[in-house]
């Protein structure tokens, strides 16, 4: 009698652990807008989530450790004039976040260490060029100040945030219909897109050329998502002709047939994929679902291996995914999600059970650090580079907020890009006002530090 051989994997027993109530963010008003983005973005310093706002669009930014009940009057980032659809933290500066909105603009914001004391209405730069709502913002993985945006005008724009100027535009001739998803390759040389015309495309954005494309990776009519995974492969999620949800793995050089195609269930929510290149695990989270499925990708058939599923009682309205440098390596945490409920944000830690408290080198290979590998000019000139890697053996401490190198460039770019209008203040007046605002922010931060020290003294007594 033959025995079934169980595949060996150190990730077979990964389990999800939701945070205790006092480690959640309570009483937050998550946006009711219908849009298939995660509505949440996190990094080692902050958690940001798109919230309900009257008279415009807003999102909430909280220091990661500021858990518990969130005051209903907590200051928000509220410069958009219509609902915010997508947010993304800069991978090279934990204090910088980009937002795309129904008001057709992309805005880039700087968040002070310690979080917001007052509502933030003025972005560092506003990027204008789309003619319809902007539903996707995505930072370049390794080049400094390079930001991509995709709008419902079927246009992708790549911006140099340091100048406020559009470097590249991929028009409707590339995508004739709504763009569902965009993902950068690990070295930032290619982008992978999915579109309402039922095609997945791999594009060299600097040349504007489609390197490869697949028509109907999934037969259903619902939206498809596509992301780069391990070397030379992409992963897609979509629906069958019978409306069953599917996940598929493809070789980018041979897109005729998938390496693996698995049917999951008959739920209607679009599956959002999150890929970890350090472990080759992909996590699938669906809006309206109450579960997170995870799979391991290997270089040998059958290539895509189901590991397990984390389930809870309440469905999710959105999901944020922590970069590897924000995890607790001493607890063997290999991923952390921030699940949005209707009035709450709940961290969920994905952990590999290990008996030893020592650093587990096999779980934590060198990972992408916060420093860019290229400048925007180098990338535009044709250079590609993988991320600069760091070790997590001694843990990761986020650096203190430093004056952004993009600030001066952003201000100049904003003045250069904006049309001259009668009655607008001079550049000298603008500079003086900005300097005063910086001084006021510094004063507020100093007063907050004094207040914190005073509270510590009172508690000690």
UniProtKB/Swiss-Prot annotation:
Pfam families registered for this protein in UniProt: DUF1899, Trimer_CC, WD40, WD40_4
Ranges of compositional bias, category Basic and acidic residues: 403-418
Compartments it resides in: Cytoplasm, Cytoskeleton; Cytoplasm, Cell cortex; Cytoplasmic vesicle, Phagosome membrane
Coiled coil: 424-460
Consequence when changing residue 134 to M: In IMD8; the mutation causes a decrease in protein stability; patient T-cell blasts show delayed activation of signaling molecules MAPK3 and MAPK1
Tissue: Expressed in brain, thymus, spleen, bone marrow and lymph node. Low in lung and gut.
Designated gene of the protein: CORO1A
Protein family per UniProt: Belongs to the WD repeat coronin family.
Summary of subunit composition and partner proteins: Binds actin.
Residue numbers carrying N-acetylserine: 2
Residues with N6-acetyllysine modification: 449
WD repeat feature ranges: 13-63, 73-110, 123-160, 164-204, 207-251, 258-296, 302-349
Protein name: Coronin-1A
Organism of origin: Homo sapiens (Human)
Region (Disordered): 403-432
Phosphothreonine: residues carrying this PTM: 412
GO biological process per UniProt: actin cytoskeleton organization; actin filament organization; calcium ion transport; cell migration; cell-substrate adhesion; cellular response to interleukin-4; early endosome to recycling endosome transport; epithelial cell migration
């Amino acid at each position: 009698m033959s025995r079934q051989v169980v595949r060996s994997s150190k990730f077979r027993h990964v389990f999800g652990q939701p945070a205790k109530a006092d480690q959640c963010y309570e009483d937050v008003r998550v946006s009711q807008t219908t849009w298939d983005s995660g509505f949440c973005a996190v990094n080692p310093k902050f958690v940001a989530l798109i919230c309900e706002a009257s008279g415009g669009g807003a999102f909430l930014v909280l220091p990661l450790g500021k858990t518990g009940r969130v005051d209903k009057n907590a200051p928000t980032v509220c410069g958009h004039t219509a609902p915010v659809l997508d947010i993304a933290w800069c991978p090279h500066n934990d204090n910088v976040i980009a937002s795309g909105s129904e008001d057709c603009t992309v805005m880039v914001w700087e968040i002070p260490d310690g979080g917001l004391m007052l509502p933030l209405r003025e972005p560092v730069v506003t990027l204008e060029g789309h003619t319809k709502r902007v539903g996707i913002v995505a930072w370049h993985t390794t080049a400094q100040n390079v930001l991509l945006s995709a709008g419902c005008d079927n246009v992708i724009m790549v911006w140099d945030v340091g100048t406020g100027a559009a470097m590249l535009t991929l028009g409707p001739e590339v995508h004739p219909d709504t763009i569902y998803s965009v993902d950068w390759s690990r070295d930032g040389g290619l982008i992978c897109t999915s579109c309402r015309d039922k095609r997945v495309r791999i594009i060299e954005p600097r040349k504007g050329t489609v390197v490869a494309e697949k028509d109907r990776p999934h037969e259903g009519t619902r939206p498809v998502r596509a992301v780069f995974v391990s070397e030379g492969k992409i992963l897609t999620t979509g629906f069958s002709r019978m409306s069953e949800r599917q996940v598929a793995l493809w070789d980018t050089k041979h897109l005729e047939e998938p390496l693996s195609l698995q049917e999951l269930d008959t739920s209607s929510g679009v599956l959002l994929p999150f890929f970890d290149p350090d472990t080759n695990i992909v996590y699938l989270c669906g809006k309206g679902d109450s579960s997170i499925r995870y799979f391991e990708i290997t270089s040998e058939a059958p290539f895509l291996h189901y590991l397990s599923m984390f389930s809870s009682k309440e469905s999710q309205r959105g999901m944020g995914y922590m970069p590897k440098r924000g995890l607790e390596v001493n607890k063997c945490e290999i991923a952390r999600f921030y699940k949005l409920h209707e009035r709450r944000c709940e961290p969920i830690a994905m952990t590999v059970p290990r008996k030893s408290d020592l650093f587990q080198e096999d779980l934590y290979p060198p990972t992408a650090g916060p420093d860019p590998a290229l400048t925007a000019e180098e990338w535009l000139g044709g250079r590609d580079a993988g991320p600069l890697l760091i070790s997590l053996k001694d843990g990761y401490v986020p650096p203190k907020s430093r004056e952004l190198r993009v600030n001066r460039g952003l201000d100049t770019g904003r003045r250069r890009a904006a049309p001259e209008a009668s009655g607008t203040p001079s550049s000298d007046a603008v500079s003086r006002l900005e300097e005063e605002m910086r001084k006021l922010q510094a004063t507020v931060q100093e007063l907050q530090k004094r207040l914190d020290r005073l509270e510590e003294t009172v508690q000690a007594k």
